[in-house]
From Swiss-Prot:
Biological source species: Emiliania huxleyi (Coccolithophore)
Keyword flag Ribonucleoprotein: yes
Keywords: Chloroplast, Plastid, Ribonucleoprotein, Ribosomal protein, RNA-binding, rRNA-binding
Family: Belongs to the universal ribosomal protein uS3 family.
Domain KH type-2: 43-115
Cell inner membrane among keywords: no
Compartments where found: Plastid, Chloroplast
A molecular-function term among this protein's GO annotations: rRNA binding
Pfam family for this entry, one: Ribosomal_S3_C
Name of the protein: Small ribosomal subunit protein uS3c
Subunit structure: Part of the 30S ribosomal subunit.
CDD domains registered for this protein in UniProt: KH-II_30S_S3
Lineage: Eukaryota, Haptista, Haptophyta, Prymnesiophyceae, Isochrysidales
NCBIfam families, per the entry: rpsC_bact
Major localization listed first in the record, in broad terms: plastid
Length: 216
């Protein structure tokens, strides 16, 4: 039976990088790793409404000796940094982040614009999950997302939805693919993400692969 590798992990150090960048001693590694986990869960859960409204694709965490830097990649950065009370938003966010970390450090926050939502599989998977949770028929939801991706100029994509589709008794997989998605080509820039849609019939699993370009 063939084994599948994670498209992102397979390319770490080639055309992908870690979302967390820091070094730690043996004794402090576990504690810092736990802090990273808490920070990411804070953005997803406690900060969830603004997180989704801004279209946050990822949060990079960089650490220096006395500094913690957060790089927030967002499709709509003005939802975070374009308001009249921008400084107040950042001040509140810094205070909440400091509560999650044991060592008091200078916290820097930077918001980075995501140029195209369609190139980020995280945002595509999340948008599809929202449609399915609103009881949109899964074939229609997939078709709408596929049409957006076709217009965006990506070289290829694959979308898969698994579970009790439209309330069927038997769980099954449905998928659609357009163009090329070369998972074994290391120079291929593949954006991969998963999401869950919580429906009245159960949980639907979503997987999205997007082939943006080749990096030589």
């Amino acid at each position: 039976m063939g084994q599948k590798t994670h498209p992102t992990g397979f390319r770490i150090g080639i055309n992908k990088s870690h979302d967390s960048t820091w070094f730690a001693n043996y004794g402090t590694y576990g504690e810092i790793l736990k802090e990273d986990y808490k920070i990411r869960k804070f953005f997803e859960n406690d900060w969830g409404t603004l997180y989704n409204k801004a279209g946050v694709s990822k949060v990079e965490i960089k650490r220096k000796v006395n500094q913690l830097e957060l790089l927030i990649h967002a499709a709509r950065p003005k939802a975070i940094a374009g308001t009249a009370d921008e400084e107040s938003t950042f001040s509140t966010l810094r205070a909440q982040i400091k509560k999650l970390t044991n060592n008091p450090k200078q916290t820097r926050i930077k918001v980075i614009q995501v140029n195209k939502m369609e190139t980020e599989s995280v945002l595509v998977a999340r948008a599809l999950a929202e449609q399915l949770e609103k009881r949109v028929a899964f074939k229609r939801a997939i078709r709408l997302v596929a049409q957006r991706l076709q217009k965006s100029g990506t070289k290829g994509f694959k979308i898969q939805v698994s579970g009790r589709l439209n309330g069927a008794e038997m769980a099954r997989d449905e998928w659609v693919r357009e163009g090329r998605v070369p998972l074994q080509t290391l120079r291929a820039d593949i954006s991969y993400a998963t999401a869950r849609a919580y429906t009245t019939y159960g949980v639907l699993g979503i997987k999205v692969w997007i082939f943006n370009k080749e990096i030589i």
